[in-house]
From Swiss-Prot:
Gene3D superfamilies: Peptidase M60, enhancin-like domain 2 (3.40.390.80), Peptidase M60, enhancin-like domain 3 (1.10.390.30)
Protein species of origin: Pongo abelii
Family under the similarity heading: Belongs to the TCAF family.
Name used for this protein in its record: TRPM8 channel-associated factor 1
Keywords, in A-Z order: Cell membrane, Membrane, Transport
Domain Peptidase M60 span(s) in chain numbering: 542-841
Subcellular location, record wording: Cell membrane
Lineage of origin: Eukaryota, Metazoa, Chordata, Craniata, Vertebrata
General function of this protein: Positively regulates the plasma membrane cation channel TRPM8 activity. Involved in the recruitment of TRPM8 to the cell surface. Promotes prostate cancer cell migration inhibition in a TRPM8-dependent manner.
């Protein structure tokens, strides 16, 4: 099949003007999907002629039938039938309603004749858009490889009929919609036409809200909210970007959990997780959805074998289902989770020709397992869903009640908001609903991840955004001059980042940026830089490998590596500041300032608008060893590795390496801070030896081998997504914490509570964690252990919250209110563990954590996990600790109490003293 660009050139070859009949008022065409594109667009941006493909065939749609019998348009008509005919020499059939067209074609030497019916022997069939008897024949003709030239307008038809839903009832749309082209009841302006030298853009927005309102009402009948509070799942956020797609459940940030769409003659409903198919509270919605998808046919509902629970929920509502491993030929509705690329085309045709598809899937786990690969581009579910105008993102949503759109109240939609953004940017005035521009930025950045090459529906948005950003200076967000996220300037930051990541050369579009992440004074090395990167990863997850290189902002770099390494699932990453700030109210930096991509070729190009340190991401269990990586367009950054970098080399790095960020590394910890801070560090060795002692203590308490299989990372940033610091890979902290990381004297005197707290968070395991009670508690065991065993700082001085009078008061307050595990959180919960440690030492904890690591099939709910902890700790210390934990109001099961009765009583149980001296409540 020819590319859209080549097809447009063929259709417009020799066409120098659009001499359309003045008395023929056309209608605007709506284009959706990935195959359709405009050919003729008026001065108002309305599409009046469009083309597409379906199956093996092709389609040209003209927005008034009189255009097809206008002799002045002969050059275009000849091009059209020539392009449509995939079998050279095959005859052209013309429906009697367009008989003059046959004469026009014959007069130009084309074998054309009037045919009342479409036949397989024809190469092209020409017909008006009002025929109601040949719908299925025309679709099958096109699908088998025939070309279809069809013309008509729907505004007059709509005025004469009772059914106002033109998109779904107009006869022509029952044919052309399978290929993504719809006749609308919007009149087309004919005052000015321009013959385009290149393919025109598809409009961002074509008004069709009225056609979808009934669908929304039917889907949400009797439903005021979509409550998944107790579903125990985190659904993916859906990106609703199609003109005929619409959200059904939104959170307070306009994040969508369930959406629906029309596509061709069929319908689609998507949920952000397959678990939502099993949520009892969603039962009424699930019934509505299946009935809507069926479209009144009362046809066969097929449920994928893995989703058999849904079958039971539907049966309660009187809907019979058939449980099958795959889609069947007689299905009306198919409910399933897409897990592979197999059958995508068949499923899309199933919907286009009238089927209903009910999809449940999340993409965040796939994204975690495939770093550097966009789920919008490669996740199997999105290969299916992108053309429908709904995509599943890697962003998760919190489970909870989701509001449903209400009639008469505007609801956020990517396309309508983008259209308003375009107007505001052009006129410098306008008013968008609160929160919409804050949502537009990340949604636009996500949309731009969908592969757009030779797909006009996506390229049109790219072209629009490039045009907008080339006109207006990109704002610079700093702490001194923050950018409000929910405004055009905030949206521009996300959209510009998305454009850069999609491959646009932003050096032509945006001015040089000067902030913490990108300096206009950085000039890349004139010659390529080759570094040896250790690409062995014995860990159980991917890891970043530092290169000691920095990439200036807006710089397109070229990365080269050996052929063998190009097939080893390596990725490249520019930037280390991974926090997503798209939900921040104010921005001190761009909301997303890193870029990742696969190193799947020996030579690869990548850019990042903001610049950043360069990393190679190595997958788990990689055994590649040292790999030479050559980079064009980089500069050196300060880098010190304990045991490898000499003091003389470090001093030279600080003086000569211009990168604004640098790293201090051991085999167990890597600190990433601004170069300005590193210049105050004359000799990093004593500091890093202390950090290695800290990491050894962290590993010892957590029963981990040392040296660590992979080093932990701590990265300083001007703004982070949550809190003062937060755990993860990497641990993130504010710039104000840099001295706490790199000042050895300060660490030894004041301690290191914050960073070790986050290192402790990374040590927590779900097997012995009882969220939310211990989330901010057990991690502090590492703080106490490190401060006392490495830094020599007693717990009472390490944190004011552990001063003995404060601890005692906290316990008494807890008991005075009536001990209840609901109130057992944070410092109060930590006290339980500290009492055990002060009585039995650290060794029982270390042995216990070792035992947990070696066990399998452990419980997952809090009550069972807490009872297992009581049993295991009691066995470790050979004391019956059930009374101790009961005093703390743990839900100790009777069988556990009985099983521990043989152990000696713990007579020193400090909770006895508290209970004896506690005032009655």
């Amino acid at each position: 099949m020819a590319t859209p660009s080549a097809a447009f050139e063929a259709l417009m070859n020799g066409v120098t003007s659009w001499d359309v009949p003045e008395d023929a008022v056309p209608c605007e065409l709506l284009l959706i999907g990935e195959a359709s594109f405009p050919v003729m667009v008026n001065d108002m941006g309305q599409v009046l002629i469009a083309t597409s493909s379906y199956g093996r065939g092709r389609l040209v749609v003209v927005s008034h039938e009189d255009y097809l019998v206008e002799a002045q348009l002969t050059p275009f008509l000849l091009n059209a039938v020539g392009w449509l005919c995939s079998s050279p020499g095959a005859p052209i059939g013309v429906h009697p309603s367009l008989a003059p067209l046959a004469k026009i074609l014959e007069g130009s030497g084309v074998d054309a004749k009037v045919e009342p019916e479409v036949k397989d022997s024809l190469g092209v069939y020409c017909i008006d858009a009002y025929n109601e008897t040949m719908t299925e024949k025309l679709v099958k003709f096109m699908k088998r490889g025939g070309g279809l030239l069809i013309g008509g307008q729907a505004w007059d038809w709509a005025n004469q009929g009772e059914d106002e839903r033109v998109l779904f009832t107009f006869p022509g749309n029952l044919v052309t919609s399978v290929a993504g082209i719809y006749f609308t009841d919007n009149k087309g302006d004919t005052s000015f036409f321009k013959v385009s030298k290149k393919m025109p853009k598809i409009p961002v927005l074509v008004s069709c809200e009225d056609d979808l309102s009934e669908d929304r009402e039917e889907l949400l009948h009797g439903i005021s909210e979509l409550d998944i509070s107790n579903s125990d799942c985190f659904p993916s956020q859906l990106l609703v970007h199609g003109a005929l797609a619409f959200p059904l459940g939104l959170d307070s940030y306009h994040g969508c959990v369930i959406a629906a769409a029309r596509y061709g003659r069929g319908r689609v409903v998507v949920t952000g997780h397959k678990v939502l198919f099993t949520v009892g509270k969603l039962g009424p919605f699930l019934l509505n959805a299946v009935r809507w998808l069926d479209g009144g046919r009362r046809g066969k509902v097929v449920v994928q074998t893995e989703l058999r629970t849904l079958s039971g929920l539907l049966a309660v509502g009187g809907i019979d289902t058939s449980i099958e491993p795959n889609l069947t030929s007689d299905a009306s509705v198919y409910c399933f989770e897409p897990v592979s690329e197999v059958g995508v085309k068949e499923l899309q045709e199933f919907v286009a020709e009238g089927g209903g598809l009910f999809v449940g899937a999340q993409a965040w786990w796939w994204a975690f397992k495939n770093p550097g690969v966009s789920p919008l581009a490669r996740f199997p579910g999105n290969l299916l869903l992108n053309p429908f105008g709904i995509s599943i993102t890697s962003q998760s949503l919190n489970p909870g009640p989701f509001r449903t759109p209400k009639a008469g109240i505007r609801t956020y939609h990517f396309r309508s908001t983008l259209a308003e953004f375009q107007v505001i940017m052009g006129r410098k005035r306008g008013n968008v609903e609160k929160g919409w521009l804050a949502k537009l930025g990340p949604d636009g950045a996500a949309f731009l991840q969908i592969p757009a090459e030779e797909i006009p529906a996506y390229m049109s948005v790219h072209r629009l955004l490039r045009k907008l950003l080339s006109r207006y200076r990109l704002p610079v967000a700093t702490r001194e001059n923050p950018v409000i996220n929910d405004c055009c300037r905030g949206a521009m930051l996300s959209l510009a980042t998305g454009l850069a990541h999609s491959g646009s050369d932003l050096s032509l579009l945006v001015p040089e940026i000067e902030d913490m992440y990108s300096s206009p004074y950085l000039r890349p090395s004139e010659s390529p830089i080759t570094v040896e990167v250790n690409c062995t990863n014995p860990g159980t997850r991917y890891c970043w490998m530092s290169t000691g290189l920095y990439i200036p902002g807006r710089q397109i770099i070229e990365v080269s590596l050996p052929e063998a390494a190009a097939s080893a699932d390596l990725k490249i990453q520019i930037g280390c500041h991974t926090d997503d700030l798209t939900r921040a109210s104010k921005l001190f930096r761009g909301p997303l300032v890193i870029n990742r991509c696969c190193l799947d070729k020996p030579t690869k190009s990548i850019t990042c608008l903001w610049g950043g340190l360069l990393y190679i991401i190595v997958p788990q269990n990689s055994k590649l060893g040292s790999v030479p990586v050559t980079v064009k367009g980089a500069v050196h950054a300060p880098y010190y590795k304990l045991g490898e970098t000499t003091l003389e080399e470090w001093k030279r790095h600080i003086q000569e390496n211009p990168g604004p960020w640098g790293e201090l590394a051991t085999d167990n910890i890597i600190l990433t801070v601004p170069t300005a801070n590193l210049r105050t560090l004359e000799n990093p060795e004593p500091l890093l030896r202390l950090w290695d002692e800290v990491m050894q203590a962290v590993a010892r308490l957590g029963a981990e081998p040392f040296p660590l299989r992979l080093p932990q990372r701590i990265v300083a940033d001007v703004q982070i997504s949550v809190g003062w610091m937060h755990a993860g890979y990497p641990i993130m902290c504010h710039l104000e914490s840099v001295q706490e990381l790199i000042n050895e004297k300060l660490i030894r005197t004041k301690g290191l509570w914050g960073p070790v707290h986050e290192l402790g968070r990374n040590q927590q395991r779900q097997e012995w964690e009882f969220p939310p009670h211990t989330t901010e508690a057990t991690c502090n065991l590492w703080c106490v252990y490190v401060h006392e065993t490495v830094l020599g700082i007693p717990r009472s001085r390490a944190n004011i919250a552990l001063w003995p009078p404060v601890r005692e008061k906290r316990v008494r307050i807890y008991l005075s209110k009536g001990p209840n595990v609901k109130n057992w959180n944070a410092w109060t919960a930590l006290e339980t563990y500290l009492q055990l440690q002060e009585a039995f030492g650290w060794e029982p904890f270390i042995r216990l954590f070792t035992e947990y690591r070696n066990q399998t099939n452990l419980p997952t709910d809090n009550v069972d996990k807490m009872n297992l902890w009581v049993k295991m700790f009691s066995h470790q210390v050979q004391k019956n600790l059930a009374p101790f934990f009961e005093a703390w109001a743990w839900p100790i099961q009777k069988e556990v109490t009985t099983s521990l009765a043989y152990l000696p009583e713990w007579k020193e149980n400090i909770m006895k003293l508290y209970l004896l001296t506690q005032m009655p409540h």
